[in-house]
Design a protein with these regions (language model features):
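Short beta->alpha junction loops/turns
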Residues: 12, 78-81, 131-134
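Structural alpha/beta surface segment adjacent to cysteine/selenocysteine redox centers
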Residues: 17-110, 183-187, 191, 195-208
Length: 210
């Protein structure tokens, strides 16, 4: 069984939220131990024609891009330990996509509030976020994702170190979560001949409520 995943993600993406909740359910409610390495990918960069020649991660004003501030905060949170990062990562996604309230990822007060709620040292986080190396890391991860795996959207999951799969889902019911995980891993890793499986929209996702 695959027990390590690399996932390219953008906090602005609701399907990243759904995958994160699904994986958390697998761990906390299904007893499946899977390590997840979350890596930043900038949807604003992928969807931009970049007419100015400036990459999203090089923009000076962190309040302009949708999620650059949150991505930098995520990398800074990793410096306080994997457990605290995972808590922060999940809480940011829940705040943005699961709270039913408007939550701007480019608002410093929002980021710092979630950081405190996640048990992070706020002063250290703010200091680490000033490290320009984090912007460079975001740029490198995004560029490598495109170059090495052809990543175009989020979440894209690397399940065996080489085969990438873009996964767009609603949150699976708990009783189906483990079976779906095994099925996805099997298709992503053992069926390299599969290029795309996509439901017509509509009728999907009519009838689903999450």
């Amino acid at each position: 069984m695959i027990d390590h995943l690399v996932i390219y993600s953008d906090y602005a993406c609701p399907f990243v939220h759904n995958v994160a909740i699904w994986l958390d359910n697998l761990k906390t409610k299904c007893g499946l131990e899977v390590s997840v390495e979350w890596k930043p990918f900038m949807l604003d960069q992928a969807n931009s024609r970049n007419e100015t020649g400036t990459n999203i991660w090089d923009i000076d004003d962190l309040t302009k891009p949708r999620s650059l501030l949150a991505q930098i905060a995520g990398l800074a949170a990793k410096r306080q330990g994997q457990n605290k990062f995972e808590t922060f990562h999940l809480n940011i996604l829940k705040s943005k996509h699961g709270s039913g309230k408007i939550f701007k990822l480019n608002d410093w007060s929002n980021i710092l509030l979630v950081a405190e709620q996640s048990g992070l040292d706020r002063d250290k986080l703010e200091l680490d976020m000033k490290d320009e190396g984090l912007r460079e890391e975001i740029g490198n991860e995004h560029t490598n994702a495109v170059k090495n795996h052809g990543v175009f959207g989020t979440p894209t999951i690397i399940s065996d170190g080489k085969n990438a799969g873009y996964l767009k889902i609603f949150i699976p019911p708990i009783e189906q979560s483990l079976e779906f995980y095994n099925n996805f891993i099997s298709m992503n890793s053992a069926a390299p001949f599969l290029g795309e499986l996509k439901r017509p929209q509509p009728p999907w996702p009519i009838g689903l409520n999450n």
